[in-house]
UniProtKB/Swiss-Prot annotation:
InterPro entries assigned: Ribosomal_uS15, Ribosomal_uS15_bac-type, uS15_NS1_RNA-bd_sf
GO cellular component: cytosolic small ribosomal subunit
Quaternary structure and interacting proteins, as annotated: Part of the 30S ribosomal subunit. Forms a bridge to the 50S subunit in the 70S ribosome, contacting the 23S rRNA.
Keyword set, alphabetical order: Ribonucleoprotein, Ribosomal protein, RNA-binding, rRNA-binding
Gene this protein is translated from: rpsO
Species this protein is from: Oleidesulfovibrio alaskensis (strain ATCC BAA-1058 / DSM 17464 / G20)
Top-rank taxon, per record: Bacteria
Listed name of the protein: Small ribosomal subunit protein uS15
Gene Ontology terms describing biological process: translation
Lineage: Bacteria, Pseudomonadati, Thermodesulfobacteriota, Desulfovibrionia, Desulfovibrionales
Length: 89
């Protein structure tokens, strides 16, 4: 399992708008980012795992689409999220 339920709940509590909020874009992007970071570390020791690399590219695309949606809907929340996650430089 990539992410323990405790870690997932801590991310949901940190980025959610209210208790039990799993659908807001901030939570979804934060969960995707955690999975992407895990897979990035995985590829440092498993360089030829091409099947998982395909999954990583899919996750990155999902995160990009969610960030694009959030930027279109609410720029302030988008900027706060990318700063908190450290996604853009």
């Amino acid at each position: 399992m990539v992410m323990t339920p405790e870690k997932k709940m801590s991310i949901i509590e940190e980025y959610g708008q209210h208790e039990g909020d799993t659908g807001s874009p901030e939570v979804q992007v934060a969960l995707l980012t955690a999975r992407i970071e895990y897979l990035t570390e995985h590829f440092k020791s498993h360089k030829q795992d091409y099947h998982s690399r395909t999954g990583l590219l899919k996750l990155v695309g999902q995160r990009r689409n969610m960030l694009k949606y959030l930027a279109k809907k609410d720029v302030q929340r988008y900027r706060a999220l990318i700063q908190k996650l450290g996604l853009r430089k």
